[in-house]
């Protein structure tokens, strides 16, 4: 069955966030329970995102950027800036609090921000697991070019590649950049799958 979902747009302090899941048409896709696209936007000098500390339990968040930078801090003591192509995976498990802010150096000038954050439901057996945070630099992610497509496996397994990101359930999360005449078949090894089209 094919379902087409138009993301709902929210304005968060001058930054547009498009939420595709959950909706009435799809409460989740596989383990993905939230799918948010941030931007694309250019934030003015002296401004940025300021998501204050807030808690999560029983899930994991995955952050991936195409442009810009976000500083992540959490109650485990993690303090990490994510940049384009990197992956931040935060396992909330039995509980974690974190904040996300534009780093000070970025605020010194106009700066772009474009990214995706997904929330993944942990299996019942892992809902109370210890909280954890892992940063994976862009160079550590499997990449391949085929048929005019550039594939980066963010999390899980696809196209014969496996991401170093530790997952708790069968996960398919791949960034695909297509040339104008490129084409790619979606990996069919997953019962539920979706395609989020940026442009």
How would you label these PLM feature ranges?
Residues 120-151:
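Long amphipathic alpha-helical segments that form oligomerization/scaffold cores
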Residues 1-7:
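Short, Gly/Pro- and small/polar-rich lid/capping loops
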Residues 57-77, 83-87, 93-97, 180-182, ...:
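Glycine- and acidic-residue-biased ligand/ion/polar-headgroup-sensing regions
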Residues 80, 86-88, 98, 112-116, ...:
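Generic beta-strand structural signal
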Residues 93-126:
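Ligand-binding loop in jelly-roll beta-barrel domains
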Residues 117-124, 137, 155-157, 177-180, ...:
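Short, structured patches in soluble enzyme cores that scaffold and shape functional sites
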Residues 35, 65, 90-91, 117-121:
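Short beta-strand segments
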Residues 9-66, 141, 146-185, 192:
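A short glycine-rich, His/Asp/Glu-containing loop-to-beta-strand
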């Amino acid at each position: 069955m094919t379902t087409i979902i138009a993301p709902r747009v929210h304005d968060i302090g001058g930054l547009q966030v498009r939420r595709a899941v959950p909706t009435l048409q799809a409460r989740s896709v596989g383990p993905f329970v939230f799918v948010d696209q941030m931007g694309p936007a250019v934030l003015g000098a002296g401004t940025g995102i300021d998501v204050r500390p807030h808690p999560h339990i029983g899930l994991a968040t995955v952050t991936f950027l195409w442009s810009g930078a976000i500083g992540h801090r959490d109650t485990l003591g993690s303090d990490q800036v994510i940049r384009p192509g990197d992956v931040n995976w935060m396992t909330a498990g039995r509980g974690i609090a974190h904040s996300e802010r534009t780093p000070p150096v970025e605020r010194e000038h106009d700066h772009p921000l474009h990214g995706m954050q997904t929330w993944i439901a942990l299996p019942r057996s892992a809902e109370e697991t210890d909280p954890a945070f892992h940063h994976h630099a862009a160079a550590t992610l499997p990449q391949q070019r085929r048929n005019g497509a550039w594939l980066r496996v963010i999390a899980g397994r696809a196209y014969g590649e496996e991401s170093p990101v530790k997952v708790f359930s069968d996960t398919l999360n791949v960034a695909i950049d297509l040339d104008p005449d490129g084409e790619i078949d979606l990996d069919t090894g997953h019962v539920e799958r979706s395609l989020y089209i940026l442009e």
